[in-house]
Amino acid sequence: MEKNERFKMHKVKKRWVTISVASATMLASALGASVASADTETVSEDSNQAVLTADQTTTNQDTEQTSVAATATSEQSASTDAATDQASATDQASAAEQTQGTTASTDTAAQTTTNANEAKWVPTENENQVFTDEMLAEAKNVATAESNSIPSDLAKMSNVKQVDGKYYYYDQDGNVKKNFAVSVGEKIYYFDETGAYKDTSKVEADKSGSDISKEETTFAANNRAYSTSAENFEAIDNYLTADSWYRPKSILKDGKTWTESSKDDFRPLLMAWWPDTETKRNYVNYMNKVVGIDKTYTAETSQADLTAAAELVQARIEQKITTEQNTKWLREAISAFVKTQPQWNGESEKPYDDHLQNGALKFDNQSDLTPDTQSNYRLLNRTPTNQTGSLDSRFTYNANDPLGGYELLLANDVDNSNPIVQAEQLNWLHYLLNFGTIYAKDADANFDSIRVDAVDNVDADLLQISSDYLKAAYGIDKNNKNANNHVSIVEAWSDNDTPYLHDDGDNLMNMDNKFRLSMLWSLAKPLDKRSGLNPLIHNSLVDREVDDREVETVPSYSFARAHDSEVQDLIRDIIKAEINPNAFGYSFTQDEIDQAFKIYNEDLKKTDKKYTHYNVPLSYTLLLTNKGSIPRVYYGDMFTDDGQYMANKTVNYDAIESLLKARMKYVAGGQAMQNYQIGNGEILTSVRYGKGALKQSDKGDATTRTSGVGVVMGNQPNFSLDGKVVALNMGAAHANQEYRALMVSTKDGVATYATDADASKAGLVKRTDENGYLYFLNDDLKGVANPQVSGFLQVWVPVGAADDQDIRVAASDTASTDGKSLHQDAAMDSRVMFEGFSNFQSFATKEEEYTNVVIANNVDKFVSWGITDFEMAPQYVSSTDGQFLDSVIQNGYAFTDRYDLGMSKANKYGTADQLVKAIKALHAKGLKVMADWVPDQMYTFPKQEVVTVTRTDKFGKPIAGSQINHSLYVTDTKSSGDDYQAKYGGAFLDELKEKYPELFTKKQISTGQAIDPSVKIKQWSAKYFNGSNILGRGADYVLSDQASNKYLNVSDDKLFLPKTLLGQVVESGIRFDGTGYVYNSSTTGEKVTDSFITEAGNLYYFGQDGYMVTGAQNIKGSNYYFLANGAALRNTVYTDAQGQNHYYGNDGKRYENGYQQFGNDSWRYFKNGVMALGLTTVDGHVQYFDKDGVQAKDKIIVTRDGKVRYFDQHNGNAVTNTFVADKTGHWYYLGKDGVAVTGAQTVGKQHLYFEANGQQVKGDFVTAKDGKLYFYDVDSGDMWTNTFIEDKAGNWFYLGKDGAAVTGAQTIKGQKLYFKANGQQVKGDIVKDADGKIRYYDAQTGEQVFNKSVSVNGKTYYFGSDGTAQTQANPKGQTFKDGSGVLRFYNLEGQYVSGSGWYETAEHEWVYVKSGKVLTGAQTIGNQRVYFKDNGHQVKGQLVTGNDGKLRYYDANSGDQAFNKSVTVNGKTYYFGSDGTAQTQANPKGQTFKDGSGVLRFYNLEGQYVSGSGWYKNAQGQWLYVKDGKVLTGLQTVGNQKVYFDKNGIQAKGKAVRTSDGKVRYFDENSGSMITNQWKFVYGQYYYFGSDGAAVYRGWN
């Protein structure tokens, strides 16, 4: 390199020397001083300025030895005086060229040297150099700055905007694009992680000269390691890390004097060596603040300047050590600095969101670098679905859970495929189940059973191992009694797990997760997200529509919530939404948790909940009354999840307690469930028939009659029966029996009734009918909304059960012969589990608050609830590493010593002694106690190891682009060796092998090998783990040489150290050598070739010739792109000149083909290096990728072609032939091509309509393309047909059989109507036909008017017999109706008649006008009884049937009504009596007739008139009753009977009749008596007839 230096004379100890001005200004820069210009400054003869030697030429060879504390170098310049440059090199240059050693000082005698090729050397005698205060004097600060220039064409780009002096690229939606490069012409513009344009045209190369200063040599000589012996280094497994310290040869005591180090004088490695220039600069800047130097260095600072600055920092460090008399502060400072560097923190471990703890690491099975951590096993994902390494053909493949689980769940993941580990798991299982015997020498304190945690995340071999132990130790396969005494359960979420366990013998019991999901979505979700109720019957391991089985197919336990299900998820959501939006996963602080629970607990008390579950009492009603599964009650549903143990009851406590107590007393027998639409919603019913009655028809015994339960519930708060009736068939055993309410929802919550008397007092007692039906009427079932219920709930039980009735069944000791251990029979159904803890309960503040103490004091309460199996919290002393929620809240699932059950100290739940007392107390009352077996993971161990790891997802699949790829990583995987693991690990294997030898010979499925007891694991280490979580230590925490990828190691056989630690001066960094840019290794100082180098956060590649490459490159089969400054594109989308997008990962490699994951469930797809955008067909499936290339999942997308599609939430495929709803509640139907249909569509049997945007029309009118109007149902969306409908404006329409609104004249159900062209019905208006005829349609009914006059808008029309109008202008001899509907008359002269009198009409008929009104109907005028038609015309010579139904006759001449005479009309003779009404004239036998007064009379079968009283049969054999000569009609009381006679006097029998009061009554088919207070099935419907005999129509069927 060329150098341009200016020299100046300085007086040093009375001798003049020449010093490079560049060197002086450099050190001045380091010191932050300000002095005059170097080439004009005058130095006095007496100046005592310190000599700051660097690449200098001295004019006096006898210059005294000078000690310095900083290095001075010169700035590179384009023009140079070659002679000066050469002169400045002097002996420093020659020293740099030496191959045998490095000179410690340029003006002293040669010291002992070290051959650079030798691996070891020994320390030499110390040279006690003295640094004076003068040597640290202030100097001049010279700084230069280079401004970035913005290309003119960049500023012209329409997408680029300038903001605050920086340029940003905006996408089509106005969002700033980050980590983005775009090709424009022949140029590439790069926008960094902030989105700002970054000039990448210049290489950031060091401008320093290659000469080495005396000070550099001095520091190198003294900072070298005391020796290469490992004892002089703080290493992990002999590997050096960023936190490593070492013993240097000398320390700069008090920052002044080099003094030989003692064995205790360790210093941070980073004080003397750095892996790259960027880290070195960051170190200097960071430590400057620590030691009080006010100076900041930038990327423009030269290596020489940084070296000088680092030396000054070292001097200040030593000064502070002298002052503080310790290095504690320095260790804290260095550790803190390390965490700021991306290669040593989580930045280089990204992505963060593919694992519960941000990310996973898989340990390499084979690695020469870490042979002690190797394994022959680590068979990942060997779940029940994939136990052999291939998918089990017995089970259903689920694309969303392909392996039925995954391996890397949390923390240090135990390798449960390792036979040695499998033996240790058996050892630990035995210890747990025999804890009382082993720890307290008291078998009564042993656990009875286990819960197996996280089954889908461990090797399924453990299920065989634990099952075989339970069979061997307890004989659970021998009989039900043994099995029920040791019911062990598993936490296994895959649908394949239960059939797997069943095929294996049902030795362990799994959860009914399907039923949990049914409760969640049918009941617990907010109203707008709830499903129907039908899944509660069918979506379960047990179909309960009719369950009359003695034994279910598979055993199971059921729950609504658990310690880690629907609790911590809700707390996470609250924290994310309301406390810390940057929170990720389950990494919370205790303070955040405390804040979240304040919101959570208040939300639980609200009617309209935002986070917590709705309808908890409804869920528990089903859990605790269902047949065929053991219910598990969760502690947090009865007591608050937070707070002291059992201190605070929830709002649902009373309801759950009531159900628990009722379960023991009533819940037994077969079960039937129904779900149907009724009223304005749907209901769910459930009936248990009682002990001894499996079927509805079973009569059972006395206990059957006093047991059983009926449930009615709904999930709609606005529910109403709307007059309908619900009938529960309680079973034949319960006919004609009283039932009473146990629990009823009210407007305020849930009311519970503990006794028959309580319910009776509340009026909540019902009686079944003779068929065992219990009926619920309109007022019984109403939806409510309160903090407990959003819907309705009623639970009913038989009256009369004894207070101490207990219907539970004991297990049989009869030998089991079906090859199964657990049987879900009545005895198993009698059990109730209690998950007796919450993750979030508070830490005890005093002894009596410890969980296990409280449990022991409350055993009687658990007994009163009917608890049979008490599931204890995991009793392990918790890790406190705070890496995951479990170790923050210390719930027992995060531990480092599995055998420490509160022996070393109290855990969250108490001490080991308190645990013993709790177990014994539970046992004393007959309860079984369950331990939590957690074989999946272990947390931060106290000792560290270096392990070869690869960054993977939770399945162990490598993460594309990760910097951690077969890399060394420091893990917390080694236990102390002096804990309870050391005491009990493997301790029981020999005993177990002797007692149960079959356990040690059975070959396990995943390995094909038996468990291996030969090695007793006394100390955990990495070789027993599959992997771990990322720990935030970064990709390069274990230090290495970038060029060679060799790790720094201090072992004898792998010794590799930076030459700096061997006393040599190393010049590193990117430099220009006159031909191109090269890189010198910070470790060896040598020029690198064929190597990737990370410098200043950028990735470079130096080719086979050692020169930096640019542009597109294919290196060892992978494609990269290097910008003009040599930096590779990383984590960047690059849009090329053709507009195609490419993605370069964290390792700089271009993603080539297939899917690549970005975040938890964010995917991109690539083909031949091109990133998919928009609609893309992948393997025959249409998928969509947004403008950033991210795959659409669970999204409705309007694609570029304007069509609407929905992409599946799991696989992202376009969904076909399916309905989907968006977040606003709009529905779409995706056709066979995946496109949302539009317009009129027939889907199944429904006729639907979809808008142009694909949204389904519901509850609205649609004008279709044919111009016709249609209406679609508000709920189903189905098209209405053959019905009237009113719009919001009050207009009526009629929708025809094709659904279209009819137009024009229509006859509908006998009515002549008219509809406008837009479908609106005409009412109260005239219509003119095309032929000019006018018609009028009534204002109320809309019916066409005939034979009447109507005034419309002041004009009078008369509408004749054909309904058409005749002009009425002063009509002569005509009647008409005025605007008020009053009939008026114009006389034959055309004059309006306003007075009174008789008038002849134009038809020569007569009308009578009274005060201007034309009379109609029966009238008395003078002495005449006359009758007028509706048009006012008098009736003459005609019969008239009056409104009373009676027949009258008016004389043909006078019009007088006929009285007491016979008249023949139309050939038929009538007799009109004294009242003027007609009577039949003969004396018929067995017939009724009306006399002249209208009184109904009767002639008996002999033809004799009946004048007395009594029952008589008529000619048709029907009965009637005559009282004092009159035939009775209507509702009558005869004797003690309430009977009914029709208008002809005929008695009603076996029929329902609507009586004169409008009510329907039913009369017995035999006696004819009116029935009361009972149900009757009539005409296909049920009616309930009350105490007055009146029916309440309910329509239940």
Swiss-Prot record:
Residue segments, region Glucan-binding? 1099-1597
PROSITE patterns in the record, alphabetically?
CW
InterPro entries in the cross-refs: Cell_wall/Cho-bd_repeat (IPR018337), Glucan-bd_rpt (IPR027636), Glyco_hydro70cat (IPR003318), Glycoside_hydrolase_SF (IPR017853), KxYKxGKxW (IPR022263)
Which reactions fall under this protein's catalytic activity? [(1->6)-alpha-D-glucosyl](n) + sucrose = [(1->6)-alpha-D-glucosyl](n+1) + D-fructose
Q: Which GO terms describe its cellular component?
A: extracellular region
Protein's UniProt keywords contain Membrane: no
Instruction: Give the enzyme's main class according to its UniProt record, as a single word.
Output: transferase
Q: Where is this region: Disordered?
A: 52-120
Q: Which GO terms describe its molecular function?
A: dextransucrase activity; glucosyltransferase activity
**Entry coiled-coil feature ranges:** none
Q: Which GO terms describe its biological process?
A: glucan biosynthetic process
Gene3D superfamilies (UniProt xref): Aspartate carbamoyltransferase regulatory subunit, C-terminal domain (2.30.30.20), Cholin Binding (2.10.270.10), Glucansucrase (3.20.20.470), glucansucrase (2.30.30.420)
Compartments where located: Secreted
Name the principal localization, coarsely classed: secreted
Signal peptide segment: 1-38
Which residue stretches does the UniProt record annotate as biased composition, category Low complexity?
53-114
Repeat Cell wall-binding: residue ranges? 157-176, 178-197, 1089-1108, 1109-1128, 1130-1150, 1152-1172, 1173-1191, 1193-1214, 1216-1236, 1237-1256, 1258-1279, 1281-1301, 1302-1321, 1323-1343, 1344-1365, 1366-1380, 1415-1434, 1436-1457, 1459-1478, 1485-1505, 1508-1527, 1528-1547, 1549-1570, 1572-1591
Q: Give its E.C. classification number.
A: 2.4.1.5
Keywords from the named record: Dental caries, Glycosyltransferase, Repeat, Secreted, Signal, Transferase
The record's misc note reads: GTF-I synthesizes water-insoluble glucans (alpha 1,3-linked glucose and some 1,6 linkages), GTF-S synthesizes water-soluble glucans (alpha 1,6-glucose). GTF-SI synthesizes both forms of glucans.
Role summary: Production of extracellular glucans, that are thought to play a key role in the development of the dental plaque because of their ability to adhere to smooth surfaces and mediate the aggregation of bacterial cells and food debris.
The similarity annotation says: Belongs to the glycosyl hydrolase 70 family.
Name the record gives this protein? Glucosyltransferase-I
Species source reads: Streptococcus downei
